[in-house]
A protein has these predicted regions:
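Charged DNA-binding/catalytic regions of mobile-element recombinases
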Residues: 1-309
Length: 309
């Protein structure tokens, strides 16, 4: 009303005159006006093809159907796009935050100066693999789990895929013991599958990243990989980031299988690991590769290789 024009004076009433006649303070008017502005104020532009309520329902359904736990809003945004639902990452983040759907984040801590430049990923597959192990409790006791996690190097192309490039799990194995023989098993699996044989020099040009565990620095382990033509690439001492690709895969494995499911026997564990490897390689998506799966990254790179004469 303060902006309306008086018919007698042909002038606006003004806020001061209106509040005096109404018997209220101008501060009260400003406070209520500010509240209405907040209610009306929304992000400019169209809302999109789907309302917030419907989009939250789609996000919940994706989380329920996903074989993995702890995927963040970026991967959920990518999976929405795969399903034909177009929206922005910021909107997905806002809705997941408002409804308590964000993945749990662990706070980091300072560990002093780093002994490496922080980059261990490669540009092509089958240039570097990483290997590591973790322990698992079963009904038979504590089983040792080993898994080889592949990677690749700059400009060096091979016919097969491995981890530090594609993040593909190339070998996985479970056993009662974690000795030098058992820890070599996932590497043997990967060599047979990716290089087609287990022979002298068959994997020449490949590097294997591992820690300084007694199994990996043993004479038997080093002799076997040297026979295959694989170059040993040990990580820095007390620098787990140096074997970060393998460490990250173990975390994914724990969060999605080992910590959420009991196992009666080692054979049951082994079968579950093989199934997880297949699911992971086919459905886990990697942000740095444009939200492609490890299998898609490998297929794309194989398609770029020149045909043999």
């Amino acid at each position: 009303m303060s902006r309306q024009v008086s018919p007698s004076t042909d002038q606006v009433y003004g806020l001061q005159r209106v509040t005096r006649i109404w018997g209220v303070s101008r501060a009260t008017i400003y406070r209520h006006r500010h509240h209405l502005d907040d209610v009306r104020r929304k992000r400019p532009g169209p809302l999109g093809a789907m309302s917030d309520k419907d989009l939250v329902a789609e996000i919940r359904q994706l989380l329920q159907d996903s074989p993995f736990h702890g995927e963040g809003y970026r991967k959920l945004w990518a999976r929405l796009r795969f399903a034909g639902i177009r929206t922005s990452r910021r909107r997905v983040l806002r809705l997941m935050r408002e409804h308590g759907l964000l993945a749990h984040q662990r706070a980091g801590r300072s560990r002093g100066s780093r002994a490496h430049d922080g980059k261990i990923t490669t540009e092509r597959v089958d240039v570097m693999w990483g290997t590591d192990l973790t322990s698992v409790m079963t009904g038979e006791g504590q089983a040792a789990l080993q898994r080889a996690y592949a990677s690749c190097a700059h400009g060096h192309a091979a016919v097969i895929a491995v981890d530090h490039c594609s993040a593909e799990c190339v070998g996985i194995h479970a056993s009662h013991r974690a000795d030098r023989f058992e820890t070599l098993e996932p590497v043997k699996q990967a060599v047979r599958e990716r290089f087609g044989a287990f022979a002298k020099g068959v994997a020449a040009g490949l590097q294997l990243r591992h820690d300084h565990g007694s199994q990996y620095v043993s004479h038997h382990f080093q002799s076997e990989i040297r026979f295959l033509g694989i170059e040993s690439s040990p990580a820095f001492v007390r620098e787990p980031e140096g074997n970060g690709c393998a460490e990250r895969f173990i975390r994914t494995l724990k969060e999605n299988l080992l910590w959420v499911r009991p196992f009666a026997t080692v054979e049951e564990l082994r079968s579950a690991l093989i199934a997880f490897k297949r699911t992971y390689n086919q459905t886990w998506i990697i942000e740095r590769h444009g939200y492609k799966t490890p299998a898609q990254v490998r297929a794309d790179q194989i398609g770029q290789l020149p045909m043999a004469a």
